[in-house]
Amino acid sequence: MARFRGSITKVSRRLGIALTPKAEKYMERRPFAPGQHGQGRRSKVSEYALQLREKQKMKYLYGILEKQFRNYYKKAVSQRGVTGDNLVRLIERRFDNVVFRAGFAPSRAGSRQLVSHGHLLVNGKKVNIPSYMVSPGDLIEFRPKSKNMSAVSDALSKTPDARIPSWIQVDKANQKAVFLAVPERVEVQEPFNEQLVVELYSK
């Protein structure tokens, strides 16, 4: 599937959130939007623009293109409960996201690469589809030939235990993780308002 090839740092500054560790460091120095008038006073933002920005935040943060993102929304609508909560819970189950949450990669782009290159197993079977939906109880581990890669070991060593969410159990020594449960919305600490996304799509 095609991926965004532009400057993630510029997108991060425009949206006001750090999408990668590199963007986070850059935004500490230049926290305003890119462009000549980035530091100037901004005009009033329309309701549509606010809704669109929140959608862009979610798409770029999780690395999802429009068609697939809209499909997640449709599935969220069809489920019981609050549509926005359902949307977040669905996306959090993505394989590349779970690999990132477990600390196996410093970014979702890095975790997506690990998955796409076939380095990982789910319950003993190779899965190389980033959008694969992980289920509670699934065991995620590296293939024997892919174990102890320096990039993974480095990422794990730099991931504090406090950053690993409660719904994922990680064995750093053996580079394994178990997806314990689908998180509740309140457990997912990300800087977006999914309700505005729901309002945008429901028009």
Curated annotation (Swiss-Prot):
GO terms for biological process: ribosomal small subunit biogenesis; translation. One of its GO terms (cellular component) is small ribosomal subunit. Signal peptide: none annotated. Gene3D superfamilies: Ribosomal Protein S4 Delta 41, Chain A, domain 1, RNA-binding S4 domain. Residues 93-153 form the S4 RNA-binding domain. Pfam families: Ribosomal_S4, S4. One of its GO terms (molecular function) is structural constituent of ribosome. Keywords: Ribonucleoprotein, Ribosomal protein, RNA-binding, rRNA-binding. It comes from the Bacteria. PROSITE patterns: S4. Belongs to the universal ribosomal protein uS4 family. One of the primary rRNA binding proteins, it binds directly to 16S rRNA where it nucleates assembly of the body of the 30S subunit. HAMAP family: Ribosomal_uS4_B. Part of the 30S ribosomal subunit. Contacts protein S5. The interaction surface between S4 and S5 is involved in control of translational fidelity. This is Small ribosomal subunit protein uS4.
